[in-house]
Amino acid sequence: MYLSDFYFDLPDELIARYPKRERSSSRMLQLNGQNGELFHRTFSDVADLINEGDLLIFNNTRVIPARMFGRKASGGKIEVLVERVLNEHHFLAHIRSSKSPKENTVLFLGEDKLGEGKGVEMLMKARHENLFELELSDKSTALLDILQKIGHMPLPPYIDRPDEDADKERYQTVYNKVPGAVAAPTAGLHFDDELLTQLKNKGVNFAFVTLHVGAGTFQPVRVENIEDHKMHAEYVEVPQEVVDAVLATKAKGKRVIAVGTTSVRSIESAALFAEENNSTHLLEPYFSDTSIFIYPGKKFRVIDCLITNFHLPESTLIMLVSAFAGYQHTMNAYKSAVENRYRFFSYGDAMFITKA
């Protein structure tokens, strides 16, 4: 298939710049992947669509305040976006500057928050293609602690506004636990504590994977034949208790429901790993990078239903949804969403999809 197959026209005013006041009050488009039927709902209705004994898979990553502003020692302005934390004092980052810093360039970051001349000193150690390896000059404080002081929430480029204090809470799921993401697993933003309690009381089971969403999730696909696209790698953890929960759910004939495309990619990576290693199980514990790319024609080994937001035209995420629900059903659903003025992208509305 071609990149242009996944294009749709999206009016700019349908891009959500701010979240709804109440998390679960967003709209939700229900799509039956088997016949293409559509139902217009509110997200809180999701409790009516999930049955006792079903298993919800959440991604418990926590978004870190990964964007920093500062200057090079020479005086030039610089913007740094953390992509991956390597250890307490080293990290990989994207850098925006009029001229890319050379090896051993000294940077001073966070002066916008700490005051002029008080920036945190960092050293550019090496370049790895599009990423820069940076190191804290002062090893007495860990990077994550420094980010809490000088970092900004890394809102996606299409939100097109500076981050605000409210984003520290709203661009974060209520069940976040493991710091490391530079973008939110946005399907999870719709769940509030009240809805989670309601689902638990109904007998719905929960399991938590960790996938640290990288900035690469916003990188455009640059090839016309989608099979030629090379996915960025992201770190995934699918522990034994998640594997056990999935196998127990399947054994009872209940459904495994992924909250977000990152949960899909985590679980399906663990299933692909099991298959490639000739495991007797449907999936195995998985602690590694994944660059799994799911597009029409690829099979789903585990996931039965998907909760997800509306994604960018020509993105790998709309390709994943098309693989799950069927290409034509997906594009018809998106057409209906535009016509009915659903809100799109990270702070937008949601879909509940059953597999084709």
From Swiss-Prot:
Pathway: tRNA modification; tRNA-queuosine biosynthesis. SUPFAM superfamilies: QueA-like. Its EC number is 2.4.99.17. HAMAP family: QueA. NCBIfam families: PRK00147.1, queA. Transfers and isomerizes the ribose moiety from AdoMet to the 7-aminomethyl group of 7-deazaguanine (preQ1-tRNA) to give epoxyqueuosine (oQ-tRNA). This is S-adenosylmethionine:tRNA ribosyltransferase-isomerase. It comes from Histophilus somni (strain 2336). The gene is queA.
